[in-house]
Regions:
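Acidic, low-complexity central loop/insert segments
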Residues: 1-81, 134-186
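Glycine-rich, charge-dense phosphate/pyrophosphate-binding loop(s)
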Residues: 72, 85-159
Length: 186
């Protein structure tokens, strides 16, 4: 869906079926945190590292601290090797440590296995993280929808905001939509 707004557009994308894949643990988790340059203690303990998909699977990795998120310098070769082992090509590292009242989380998405060292803003990561937040009750949800905004791209000077709407039935995420403002630049 595309809605014109002034000199730009609001683009809304309904994502595919929500699917929860493997939890990454043991040696693969150790390899992952090492490749990211973090420790297991940096992870949000209530948020298991897990593959989640709404069309394109990503590994969800919740960490406690924004400064650490901002300063990540992943070992892309190691992430690439790990992608072959776990059958997932993207890693979405996020934190709820946001000083901005309208921004629930900030994230970074790495996918070196498909030639993307860092994606500045991606619905293919923020959509699944919305479903993941619902599944693990990581934030308070008061009705049948979770609506939030997330930021990405700050660490590579290509900042953008994405809006996420998760429809919930029987406490489970059933439909995810992402939206944001797009501007034609050519």
């Amino acid at each position: 869906e595309i809605e014109p707004i002034d000199n730009s557009y609001n683009v809304i994308m309904t994502q595919g079926k929500v699917e929860f894949g493997d939890i990454i643990d043991g040696k693969n988790l150790d390899r992952l945190v090492s490749a990211l340059g973090i420790d297991n203690d940096d992870l949000i303990k209530e948020a298991p590292v897990q593959i989640v998909s709404t069309g394109h699977s990503k590994v969800m990795i919740g960490i406690k601290d924004y400064k650490q998120l901002h300063n990540l310098r992943p070992d892309m070769k190691e992430l690439n090797k790990l992608s072959d082992i776990i059958n997932c090509n993207g890693y979405f590292v996020f934190t709820f440590d946001s000083k901005e009242k309208d921004i629930l989380l900030k994230g970074r998405m790495f996918a070196p296995a498909i030639g993307i060292e860092e994606d500045p803003v991606t619905g293919n990561a923020n959509g699944p993280v919305g479903a993941y937040i619902v599944k693990y009750n990581l934030v308070k949800i008061e009705n049948d929808n979770l609506n939030f905004s997330a930021k990405q791209g700050m660490s590579i000077d290509r900042e953008g905001t994405i809006n996420v709407n998760v429809h919930i039935e029987n406490s489970e995420p059933v439909k995810v939509q992402v939206s944001g403002t797009a501007t034609v630049v050519f």
